[in-house]
């Protein structure tokens, strides 16, 4: 079954408890096929799992605003880890994933509303997906960020591997 009802299941992996190798079960879509709906936008936020219920209720209050722009959403849990810049650093989280229709203006208007609703639960956004959280707030959420910056300075002192995203989100104080 395809998570988006209007799409064919031909490009999806077998699901619903069917045993198989991890590479055929963890992803929703088969290698070499169009993922999801094709042209789309994505965002994802992680909150400590103990706040799952309250976060779900908070997001549900935005349903009327979110639904017109949403292809699919997913809620999942992820075990804590020890990776400094992981949203799961020392905390098991619940993730709220959104696959949006390709309407950048609408999505970028919705994200601050979602972030505001999740704020009491100290959300951490997915680094590789859309978010509007300020660099100051983002930096505060990652307690080992300063240690990471020291590693960057040690191993990349000239900034060869830095880009605008890192400059804005890791080094900006706004």
Per-region residue spans from a language model:
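Noncatalytic alpha-helical scaffold of FAD-dependent oxidoreductases
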Residues: 1-174
